Each structure stands twice: as structure tokens, then as C-alpha cells.
Amino acid sequence: MAKVLVLYYSAYGHIETMANAVAEGAREAGATVDIKRVPELVPPEIAKASHYKLDQAAPIATVDDLANYDAIIIGTGTRFGRITSQMANFLDQAGGLWAKGVLHGKVGGAFTSTASQHGGQETTLFSIITNLLHFGMVVVGLNYGYGGLTTLDEVAGGSPYGATTITGGDGARQPSANELGGARYQGKVIAETAIKLHG
């Protein structure tokens, strides 16, 4: 049975919610799924003053954990059109795995959030995907089999490069049913691909 890691960073809980949806989809496909998060870099007093969501259930991942999975699905919020420093710091430590080719052939995917529709969703997805390709991974996005990608009836995240959500400038908007559906769909497709490749 394929093993899937949903690895994320979430300051305010939006990506945590998306990560849970991605994991639901992967489990639906029959994979064994773990959800883990990367370490926080912001000092606790500043994170608390900034109203970060610090009570997240997922355990903290280590870089060595990456070797134990057939698929790794990475989610993080957007900072100025790119991945957060927390996720970048974590992935930058995977040089040893990269040098040994440990991640070659594993399946990967990306998901993100932005404050607005035009806040850098696709550039952030590409910054995750670039890491996955350097690791030698097989990248799977959110294909148009998910009909919610083409909706014009609502403000909605989502891209063929990965599931996304829009949070609003103050973070008040939570992932919509359509966005969560996209996350579940992507998780399922990635897990199905991992099962085909790795059993």
C-alpha cells in the first residue's frame, strides 16, 4: 500500500484545513496517509501577538521523514508570490536526500493559499514544484477532471498546478466547499498515481 505524506506550513489555519482535505482524498484512494507540518521559525511571542494558529494537531516533520513515503504533497501559504520561509528552510535542508537520489521517482504535488485571487497562487505552486523536480519527483497537479476548476459562479481558488484557497486580506475567508473539493480530488489523484507506481 502506498504511503503518502501531506507536509504543510500554516500560519493561520487555512493550509491546515486544506491539508486535511488533501489527506482525505489520498485515504479515499486507499493510501496510508500521514499529515505533518514543518517547524515554525517565528519567535513564539511574535507568533502569538500576530494571532498565528499555534494549536495545530499535526506533528512536526523531520527532513529524514521524506525518505519514508511514496508520495509527498506539500502545502504552504504565499509570501510575496513565493513559498514561506518556514517551508523553504525545511526543503533547503533536504540537500543530503537530493545528493543521494533518495526522492527520485516519488510522486509529488503542491497546494497553497493567497489573500487575493491574484496574490501569487501559481508562482507559489511553481516554487514548490521546482523543488519537487530538483528532487527527481513525478509531479501531479489538479487536473480538469475536477469540474470546480472551471466554475464562474463564485470566487474560487484552484489551478491545474495545484489546489488553492483564497483567504481574504484579513484571513476571515475559510476554504470553500469547491476549494476543499479540489484539495480532496488532488490528494486522491496523487495517491492513485503513487499506488500505480509503487504498489
From Swiss-Prot:
Keywords from the named record: Flavoprotein, FMN, NAD, NADP, Nucleotide-binding, Oxidoreductase
GO cellular component: membrane
Binding sites annotated in the UniProt record for NAD(+): 12
EC nos: 1.6.5.2
Catalytic activity: a quinone + NADH + H(+) = a quinol + NAD(+); a quinone + NADPH + H(+) = a quinol + NADP(+)
Pfam families (UniProt xref): FMN_red
Cofactor names: FMN
UniProt xrefs under PROSITE patterns: FLAVODOXIN_LIKE
Binding site for FMN: 10-15, 78-80, 113-119, 134
Residue ranges of domain Flavodoxin-like in the record: 4-190
The organism's place on the tree of life at top rank: Bacteria
Residues reported to bind substrate: 98
InterPro entries named among the record's database cross-references: Flavodoxin/NO_synth (IPR008254), Flavoprotein-like_sf (IPR029039), Flavoprotein_WrbA-like (IPR010089), FMN_Rdtase-like_dom (IPR005025), NQO (IPR037513)
Cofactor: how bound: Binds 1 FMN per monomer.
MF (Gene Ontology): flavin adenine dinucleotide binding; FMN binding; NAD binding; NADH:ubiquinone reductase (non-electrogenic) activity; NADP binding; NADPH dehydrogenase (quinone) activity
Claim: 4Fe-4S is one of the keywords in the record: no
Family: Belongs to the WrbA family.
Protein name, UniProt field: NAD(P)H dehydrogenase (quinone)
Organism classification: Bacteria, Pseudomonadati, Pseudomonadota, Alphaproteobacteria, Hyphomicrobiales
